[in-house]
Amino acid sequence: MGSPVTFVGAADVPHCSPMTRAVGVPNVRVNSVAVSCQGHVNTPHLRPVPGIPPCIIHTAAILTGSLRVRVTGLGIGRVGDIVGPLCTAVAAGSPNVLAG
C-alpha cells in the first residue's frame, strides 16, 4: 500500500511557522491540483537555528519521493517524505490517491 500523494497547497509539518507545498507540475494533477514532486519547494517559512534567535526565513524541497512513481522524471511527493535539509516532512496529501 502507498502513501497519500501531496500537491500544491498541502501542508508540511510546521516548526517555527506553518508552510505548504508551493511548487508542482502544472499539467499533472491530483484531485484537480498540481502534484508536488522531489525537488519542489514549500512556501517561505521560519526555521529554528540553534543559538540564533529568532528563526530564519527559508524554503526547502522534498528530498525524497517515490522510487516507483515518477512525474516528469521526478519521484512523486507523498505524506511522510522528508523536506530539507534540516526542515520537516510532508504532512498532507490526497485522501484518495496513493503512491508507493
Language model regions located:
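Intrinsically disordered, low-complexity proline/glycine-rich segments
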Residues: 1-100
